[in-house]
């Protein structure tokens, strides 16, 4: 097939079945021509599909998205960038699209890549548009990872659907004890708060939290921790409570 002739036909002809002709072009490896057919017909999403699936040029797809500036095009670009592990670029594209629909995959890949801090902006967009426990839960965790504790306090004071206890445990396991303290306090989980305060060397606070928890195993933990730290007066208080 003479590609120059095909291009000329596309420019001159009209009234043909766009999808059928574009498919024939793709089947024959004429990807640029298929892109041209879809673009001329204003089938922008199909044109974008050709760029990312057949021509395989994310840079050209980015240029195409910038040129058209349409939500559905930004969204398609975001998915292609995510598939190519361009995580930050993908999140930026989804934000431009105001499209939170692929949040599960975005969260999974961003967290695996250690991009929690950059994920915050995407999650802020997603929270405005949808009410999902996973989004709020990840948002709280990302704020903790970014050490944005004042923002976390503000988030916890507002209505949210986060699994706060899960985030608290995750932060505790990561050694983010100040974040854990805020999280456990916000849900009045005094048993876990007591343990966290021991790690923060706040022994009087830990004893008070243990008292509120009223749990024998928590008191035993307080007793051992206070002895280990040389806090004998507090260890005696904990021991008497066991």
Role assignments for model-derived ranges:
Residues 1-242:
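Extended alpha-helical assembly domains of large eukaryotic scaffold proteins
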